[in-house]
Amino acid sequence: MRFTQKFSIRWVSVCLLMAAVRISAQEINISHCLNSCPDVSRPTNEVSLHHVFAAAVIPETGEVEWVAYRILPESIGIASLLPRWWEADRLLRGGQRDAALEQTPGFVQPDISNAQDREYRTGEIRMAAEDRGRLTPMTSFAATPYWPELNQLSNMSGLPQSMRTGPWSGLDQAINELTAVVAPLYVVAGPVMSHQSKGRSSESDRADAFYKVVSDGQRVAAFLFDANLPPHAHFCAQVSTLAEIEGQVSLALFPDAELDDDAELVAALGCS
């Protein structure tokens, strides 16, 4: 109840074209983001704001450009028994049509033995069932009443299973554990698309890599995951820099914050 009372007042689900807008010379700040949310690659992209995360979506393709979220100690919980399903984000003006996805919550993944059921369509993006995952992890918000929002397509990306269940998941766990001593933590995550495939909707287009950047408000730790990483790879071997990742995605991820890549923050995540 304490969590609900604390956060229901501060967070509101709306859909904006920009993460921060100025109305009568006043700036609206989004609590998911540090000072302000990341840039978007085009003015037509939509930013969908929910109780536990914000997401930038390319309306023509349904691609998620980035997600941003803030983790607090009281938001973290056990997510192993929470049902997983996919549903369209109703806050997006363009919708996420033609999403032939499982609509009923359940604890068991659907049978994908039939080849016709092995692909799911999100707008014009198609991805194999095993290569879809949540950019914002359920574990970070399992203790809140808003965890079902993480089943929306605006939180889905083509995360390869081997990478997602290995080093990517390991970093999520390390971030959650760090909130016990450092909170809040601000996280931005998303895909790194090749320059040839950006803005296109070809079935063969896949992200070359995925990034996750975490900040305590002053320091930043950046990680870049090659899409072909095996499950036994460790997230500590994927340490990058904020400048490197921003250069690859051509976006400012923390546009109104002065942050330094910090070895101590990386070490606090378990990387010596």
Please place each PLM-identified region on the residue numbering.
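Domain-level detector of nuclease and nuclease-like folds
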Residues: 105-272
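Short, His- and charge-rich active-site/binding loops that engage polyanionic ligands
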Residues: 51-129
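Short linear interaction motif-like sites in intrinsically disordered regions of transcription factors
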Residues: 12, 67, 86-87, 148, ...
